[in-house]
Regions:
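Ribonuclease/tRNase effector modules and their secretory precursors
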Residues: 1-121
Length: 121
């Protein structure tokens, strides 16, 4: 199991991905839970682990109507940091990409590698 610090550091630097199939209303419930109170990075990490375990246990099927799905949501941590969760669907309705990255004023927080890529372009 990854430590909390390693998880947050990696998420802030690289993001992460995993395969998941889950309907939109679960995210709505999760979003409202988070918006009602501030979460520490530790709590965010624990919720993320719980969500992963729940998805692995259920293996829920995606429905045909893509419009019933969101493409991302924000989570605010108690230290003022915000995290953006994003995901996308493949043509066969499988939810394939699920990313987490830190945001500043609604924009992705730039890492050193992002800056170097921008300069090289």
């Amino acid at each position: 199991m990854v430590s909390r610090k390693a998880f947050i550091d990696k998420a802030n630097q690289e993001g992460f991905s995993f395969n998941i199939q889950i309907p939109w209303w679960t995210y709505n419930n999760f979003k409202s839970l988070v918006w009602r109170k501030s979460l520490s990075e530790e709590q965010l990490y624990q919720i993320f682990l719980s969500l992963c375990r729940e998805v692995e246990d259920r293996q829920m099927q995606a429905v045909a109507d893509k419009r019933k799905y969101q493409t991302g949501f924000y989570v605010a941590a108690c230290n003022g940091h915000e995290f953006r969760f994003e995901y996308a669907f493949k043509k066969n309705q499988e939810l394939r990409v699920y990313n987490l990255f830190e945001t500043v004023n609604g924009r992705k927080k730039l890492t050193l590698m992002d800056l170097l890529d921008y300069i090289m372009d």
